[in-house]
Structure formats: structure tokens, C-alpha cells
Amino acid sequence: MTREEVRSVILDRLELRPGAVFWDIGAGTGSVSAAVALACPEAEVHAVECEPEALALLARNRERFRLHNMAIHPGRALSVLDALPNPTHVFVGGSGGELSELLSRLTRIPVRSGLLRVKF
């Protein structure tokens, strides 16, 4: 789980606006996804995670905090990115050893705002 201080810095640096489409790649238990969903209820939050235990906690946290603007996408990031809406913001919390390929893929994705922020 990402520490609270780190989540605060992430939220500050992302400069989220209503209508944002946020990808949390390697979402883990969803602490960053939940923070974004709570801070910007008008944003679409897409949490990508492949570990079964983390997915269970991610789903539990989504229900616990009633995060209706957060979707969970099980699987490895490189296999699910094409099914997601184009992002305005991306946070890479984990890459499963595929960071180089993931970053290469992210640079080829059309971005709604014309600017893609990748924070990791």
C-alpha cells in the first residue's frame, strides 16, 4: 500500500480535473486509485492489477468506500490497456518487470488532453 504522504504528493502532482481518465497500472490494493476516485469524483479511474490477492482487496476497498467511478481491470497491463479509454493521467505503481515495454506502449497511446503524465 502506498503511504498517505506519497498519495498526497501524487494527487498534488497529477492536477486532476473533472473529466479526467486516470489509469493506475499495478494498482495493488487500490490506495492510489481510491485516493484519486475520492479526490475527483468526476474522474474515471481504471485500476489494473494481476495479483489475485490484491484484486480481492481492490474490490473490497472499492465497495467499502463506494467508489462508483473506479473500474477494476484484472490482468497484466500490456494485455488490458487496449480495452481502456484513452487516459489523461497514468500512474505506474508496478509493472511486473515489464516497465520498458509498458513505457514504450504508453508513448504510443492517443491522449485526450494531448499531454500524458506518467508518474512512477
Regions found by a protein language model. Give the residues of each.
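Conserved alpha-helix/loop element of class I SAM-dependent methyltransferases that forms part
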Residues: R3-P18
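Conserved class I S-adenosyl-L-methionine
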Residues: G19-G28
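Conserved SAM-binding loop of SAM-dependent methyltransferases across substrates and taxa
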Residues: T29-P41
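Conserved S-adenosyl-L-methionine
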Residues: L38-V45, I109
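S-adenosyl-L-methionine
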Residues: V48-H89
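Short beta->alpha hinge that forms the Motif I/post-I loop of the SAM-binding pocket
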Residues: E49-A54, G94-S95, F120
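Short SAM/SAH-binding signature in class I
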Residues: N86-G94, E101, L115
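A short glycine-rich, Lys/Arg-flanked "PGG" loop and its adjoining helix->strand segment in the class I
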Residues: L103-L115
